[in-house]
């Protein structure tokens, strides 16, 4: 008991020293905790947050976690309390077997700071295991001649606990022949031996029953028992003897299964059954019994399972030899396992970033890596590296930890991802290595602007394109990815001819296709300059511009326009004069036309499409000049009708036609004399008016019917007055009727000859109007022109006039329009005019029938139009000065029935001349004096 107490005190002193040493080490840098084994899951181990200088909230926010190597996690972190707790029940015996102290080492990784803190937790043993023997019963024989003092080794008990909780003492049940002696072995465990105290007598007691008790030093004390049966046999005086006092062998760990490792040998000089020796393991660990096999007859030891240097570096076992009479001998066998390089390094990626932006600076941490090799010596010394052509490097930390960092700035546009191979190799022979791959994606940032495929674009578009048609497309590309490469197109706002660009063009924001919002006209504009912007969807967005030139191509969409002779609204033209004495090639007139197109679409050619007298006239192909093709003959008709076609050279060609009326005569007076023989009749117009009113009355309501009746009565009254005036013609001063001629196409005719005709000198209230039928195709024949007649008026009416009929007012020399008086509707005329402009087709037809030309002015050649005799001043129209402004003012020559006013020229008033309505009328001078 004294010895046991002494041992207990020593153990406590050793534990105290060991604890002080651990505390000193923890104070030097490591964090040290202790926890009893078999505590419940979640038991408190230590305040790790306090020891690390962290707040409990930082355990969750900072990514603090436990990094352990190759085993199930034994501990966990409580983020709320900041404490280290057990993750499961811990069995110290399973974890450390008989090792003391039992330390569990791991690292605390603070990912936010990328720091490692080593932590050691000592597992404190508790008395949770009872000492046990491998056998429940032990039976052996002892010769009765065995001398007192003979020692018999007994099986020793095993207690998985350590320290005071391990096996501390043995006790043998009381027996007069046997006693117990416990020997302290050199390798640590106690070896119980049974000592024969007095000689045996088989005849007195053949079998002895003993109980061996093994007890530990825990609180409470635990114990195990072994029943021993000793059979006393007859005398066998020679026990087996081994050839060696101890067997020792070195075996490489990679020996094949079933390899004979060594052979023990024991001899017995006895004969017969007393000399037959059998072998068996005695007092071996259960793991040893699982790995090795002992042949009971030959003593051969072989391995049943692979040897592992990393598990056991040396195996110690005891082999027992027993003869047939029960005598035994024991020998110790030591098998040392030699390490071979059979374990490749283990690479563990503790923390890794799978994606990194391309603009991160060098030194960015990508991964945290640990390397471990279970071999020893050079076989367990490892190095770690990556390929040298990568923009990364490995930096070694503590305890075989490495971190992978960027060595230079990454560029996703060059390489969008990396497959990094990390190789760990040991120094064994042959060297073993392990490769681990990390896939790293380089994420994009918006560092590239869109780039167009061309520096500038040009496109040619035919005019008259349909609205909404696709006319061009631009494309740009962006080296970035995802939304940073999603390009939208837009037009930079500009103006074209005062209108916004968006009114003409639009662009598809996704495809870059340009669409026309309207049909373009080459004659309006011929090109457009615009800029297209390509913008990506990055943050912030980047953009680039490109210039685009759109050129319109002319299409033949405009027919030639005939400038001269100008076409009045009713389609008729003026009358051109060709003298009878004209030689072949005589210039009669000239057709002037233009085309708003360009190029060959505007090249014009002229041809004579139709003529009333084929072969009489010709038209210049490119000049449009109408000339006589032969000399004029008496048999040629006085009126020649020509249809001239003007055609451009477009595809398809467009054309326009004009009808010319050529009068064959030497003088204008001849034509007027021939045409004046026709008697004007006012009744057709009255009948037309009546018919018009009847048709209109059928289409309108009853209200309009009353109005038509009143209007008809008014017209009949006027007609009655005119008949009364004609009946009083006895006192009317006569004038040849041939001096007043109705001419077909009067409005065009009077573009050249501007005259106005009046019957009396002072006809302010009533003028005699001679409506003339519209002869559209032929001039009045010569026979009709030879008829003589006089127009008469009542003498009383003539006496009221102050000017003679023979005196004619000079024509209005300002017969051209000013810029503000170009042909247009009545609403565009000068406000100074007192006349009324016809505003419907009916009034226009009446106006044409009532306009007369002055014969006397044409006969004496005093016209202010200019030109030589017989030409009627036509040459002035063919010169370069002829423009569209050379249009007569018809209002100087017009009398409106039912009105007491005539249309006048405001310019005449400014010149101090009398209005055309007064100066243009023929008045008799004699009557003027009488008045």
Curated annotation (Swiss-Prot):
Key word Cell membrane present: yes
Main location: membrane
An example molecular function term from Gene Ontology annotations: calcium ion binding
TM segment ranges: 693-713
GO cellular component, one term: plasma membrane
Glycosylation sites per record: 265, 419, 545, 685
Sequence ranges of Basic residues compositional bias: 921-931
Residues in the Cytoplasmic compartment per record: 714-931
Pfam family, one: Cadherin_C_2
Keywords per UniProt: Calcium, Cell adhesion, Cell membrane, Glycoprotein, Membrane, Repeat, Signal, Transmembrane, Transmembrane helix
Chain spans, region Disordered: 801-840, 901-931
Compositional bias per record (Polar residues), positions renumbered to this chain: 805-840
Family annotation (InterPro entries): Cadherin-like_dom, Cadherin-like_sf, Cadherin_C, Cadherin_CBD, Cadherin_CS, Cadherin_N, Protocadherin/Cadherin-CA
Membrane topology: Single-pass type I membrane protein
Protein name (Swiss-Prot/TrEMBL): Protocadherin gamma-A1
Organism: Homo sapiens (Human)
Gene: PCDHGA1
